[in-house]
Amino acid sequence: MALRMLLLLLLLWCSNPGSAENSSLPGPPYNHTNGRLPDRDTGSAVLRLFYVITGLCGLISLYFLIRAFRLKKSQRRRYGLLTNTEEHEEMASQDSEEETVFETRNLR
């Protein structure tokens, strides 16, 4: 019995006084508001924002690089006058049955 009493007194002596919200003992006044944000949270948010922006810029540049190399346009064939006078093309007229021969030697 004395051992139980000693243990009970030891526990009461080591216990913390109750908080102001849940105790019959008055505690010191406590201010729940804090005027500034903790530095650790602000720094990690800025660092996370930096990583997100860097990742987005990397993805956008990768998209444009892939688009530039995959959709490389082949050289367009330029149509103009024939340089060789031996090459003649005959085209049939749809309106009449006459044949028209196009020559390039006098067109320059």
Swiss-Prot record:
Q: Which UniProt keywords apply?
A: Glycoprotein, Membrane, Phosphoprotein, Signal, Transmembrane, Transmembrane helix
Which residues in this protein are found as Phosphoserine? S93, S96
Glycosylation sites recorded in the entry for this protein: N22
Report whether Lipid biosynthesis shows up as a keyword of the record.
Answer: no
Q: Has keyword Membrane?
A: yes
Q: Which family does it belong to?
A: Belongs to the FAM174 family.
The entry's protein name is Protein FAM174C
Organismal lineage: Eukaryota, Metazoa, Chordata, Craniata, Vertebrata
Q: Which gene encodes it?
A: Fam174c
